[in-house]
Amino acid sequence: MARAKNGTVHVARRKRILKKTKGFWGTKKSNYKKAKDTLRKGMMYATRDRKARKRDFRRLWISRISAALSDTGISYSRFIEGLLKSNIKINRKILSNLAIEDAEAFKKIVLEIRR
């Protein structure tokens, strides 16, 4: 009886890794050992940066809102407190877009909070 060495699975696994590293530079796309390590590291970065992207966007929205509020003479923390007290339920992303694209609507929200 012939010895079964699981060759098809071995080849398929290597092909799968090398297929995922298609656009990489140098031997990281063709050498299995380097490709495997680079892919693992890339997946770690991807996971980390998906989490970081959420924090980065929230920070950006807060900066934009704060910059738009500098003209009105109200601080960001007072603005958010006023939103909660006025029961205005608009998230930071929408407020940021309003501050950039529709300044009049944003100023109306600020006036509503000051009342």
UniProtKB/Swiss-Prot annotation:
Coiled coil: none annotated. The keyword Ribonucleoprotein applies. Keywords: Ribonucleoprotein, Ribosomal protein, RNA-binding, rRNA-binding. GO terms for cellular component: ribonucleoprotein complex; ribosome. InterPro entries: Ribosomal_bL20, RIBOSOMAL_L20_CS, Ribosomal_protein_bL20_C. GO terms for biological process: ribosomal large subunit assembly; translation. GO terms for molecular function: rRNA binding; structural constituent of ribosome. NCBIfam families: rplT_bact. Binds directly to 23S ribosomal RNA and is necessary for the in vitro assembly process of the 50S ribosomal subunit. It is not involved in the protein synthesizing functions of that subunit. Belongs to the bacterial ribosomal protein bL20 family. This is Large ribosomal subunit protein bL20. It comes from Borrelia garinii subsp. bavariensis (strain ATCC BAA-2496 / DSM 23469 / PBi) (Borreliella bavariensis).
